[in-house]
């Protein structure tokens, strides 16, 4: 028994120091492309509308529309999926369980949060560092002007959406993604609106869990 404990302890020590066993978050999951036209990023009001958070709606089938985007800038979004049982038709990603930030092979979900900030002149989706404040804050998307209600957020150049994958299996989690860190970053915001979980389910559909 003593020999077993010694061997086990040595094994644990090697596992803790071996780079082959210490998987980075970005190396565990990969990404697959999505049809961006099937998605809309939305600044969605919380409560009485004094704050907002990021929602992402996905049109999975053509059975009936999941959302409607108005004309003009900023564009108002009608979340049609909230008026019917959209199981199998739409997906709705409402918090950090359903989406996260990724740059290249680096999964930044635990190091950055995606926050909707109303600057008074625009509505911005910011990627804000949560662990190291010296890291840059990045502007991911903008509404294009001041507005209230459900407002479309348009991705900045270089940003897109991709789906998380594990091996050959696509998962029910989206990445707000770009290939490399942008050269210019946004100044730090004094009071970002946190996109903390509000509802109970991150993806309202019968998708495979996102892990």
Which ranges hold each PLM region?
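Bacterial N-terminal signal peptides that target proteins for export
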Residues: 1-8
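Short, surface-exposed beta-edge/turn micro-motifs
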Residues: 10, 37-39, 50-53, 111, ...
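Intrinsic-disorder/low-complexity peptide segments enriched for small residues
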Residues: 10-12, 205
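C-terminal segment of classical bacterial N-terminal signal peptides
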Residues: 14-23
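Extracellular/luminal recognition modules and glycoprotein regions
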Residues: 23-81, 145-187, 207-209
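Structured domain cores in non-transmembrane regions
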Residues: 58-124
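Low-complexity intrinsically disordered segments
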Residues: 98-194, 199, 203-211
